[in-house]
Amino acid sequence: MSTVTITDLARENVRNLTPYQSARRLGGNGDVWLNANEYPTAVEFQLTQQTLNRYPECQPKAVIENYAQYAGVKPEQVLVSRGADEGIELLIRAFCEPGKDAILYCPPTYGMYSVSAETIGVECRTVPTLDNWQLDLQGISDKLDGVKVVYVCSPNNPTGQLINPQDFRTLLELTRGKAIVVADEAYIEFCPQASLTGWLAEYPHLAILRTLSKAFALAGLRCGFTLANEEVINLLMKVIAPYPLSTPVADIAAQALSPQGIVAMRERVTQIIAEREYLIAALKEIPCVEQVFDSETNYILARFKASSTVFKSLWDQGIILRDQNKQPSLSGCLRITVGTREESQRVIDALRAEQV
């Protein structure tokens, strides 16, 4: 009699999965953490809700109302979740039939779209971006049959550039009545003029992902948002967990989205953008740096001579960057989060000393 192992009992698609390599999972013993696009210093909050004996609201009223006001949408168009990552998964669970439907995304881009789909047993289709990292609209059009959700990250992680708005419009027309288009705006606070929130009335199949992890400096809170028309939000409410946000998370999120919280966030954005420009200018003068790409975000993508050697050398000095070599069209590329001036200087000095 053959022995069935625990692994044999698992779903076949789960047995074949590779866990997503988050920045934290990759580890390292650094003291300069520039690999996860976090804000470099902690922001202090005091808890005001002392009701931990009670279950929280599924969609905390203060959080929803504050975010709706900030984003310029109606409260009925907002869903709050455990980070934007949960929003990615909820959209697949609500709209994709496992073993039948597909999602589509355009690498090089954020890795969680594929992880979420594969976990659920939904097919992933990819249409690599063009040489300038803009959408290959013809390629997308050719692969749309059977696709229910299309993910587009703008500004794109890890390349840092915005997707051409006219291309977004073309994509939304191509998918009308066929698929949900998800604009991942995790980094939109660094270029707010490019947000698609004003398009929701025009496109009922548009959904927008947002987060408090970047400009709001709350990556450890795990709080994100999906903005969409009420019909989409109502469907997502059918598949979301009953208590996605703990009471302390909702408490801090509401404070971060208060008028004072928004002002503080905008000050952080101004400071990070100034630091980004300083770091870009310095990187362009360093011999081992072959190319520095423009960025609309809180990180910089650059191509290096002997990038693996450079990555390991900085790692050994406690400076942890994000290696993008395995992504399509990103050979030799490392991604550097914009940190404090001291952290920028550590990176600059270490790179200047590289003999490659």
From Swiss-Prot:
Organism domain of life: Bacteria
EC number, as in UniProt: 2.6.1.9
Stored Pfam families: Aminotran_1_2
Keywords: Amino-acid biosynthesis, Aminotransferase, Histidine biosynthesis, Pyridoxal phosphate, Transferase
GO biological process, one term: L-histidine biosynthetic process
Cofactors required: pyridoxal 5'-phosphate
SUPFAM superfamilies cross-referenced by the UniProt entry: PLP-dependent transferases
InterPro entries (UniProt xref): Aminotrans_II_pyridoxalP_BS (IPR001917), Aminotransferase_I/II_large (IPR004839), HisP_aminotrans (IPR005861), PyrdxlP-dep_Trfase (IPR015424), PyrdxlP-dep_Trfase_major (IPR015421), PyrdxlP-dep_Trfase_small (IPR015422)
Residue numbers of N6-(pyridoxal phosphate)lysine PTMs: K214
Catalytic activity line of the entry: L-histidinol phosphate + 2-oxoglutarate = 3-(imidazol-4-yl)-2-oxopropyl phosphate + L-glutamate
A GO molecular function held by the record: pyridoxal phosphate binding
Database matches in Gene3D superfamilies: Aspartate Aminotransferase, domain 1 (3.90.1150.10), Type I PLP-dependent aspartate aminotransferase-like (Major domain) (3.40.640.10)
Biological or metabolic pathway of the protein: Amino-acid biosynthesis; L-histidine biosynthesis; L-histidine from 5-phospho-alpha-D-ribose 1-diphosphate: step 7/9
Subunit structure: Homodimer.
Family label: Belongs to the class-II pyridoxal-phosphate-dependent aminotransferase family. Histidinol-phosphate aminotransferase subfamily.
Name of the protein in its database record: Histidinol-phosphate aminotransferase
Organism: Escherichia coli O139:H28 (strain E24377A / ETEC)
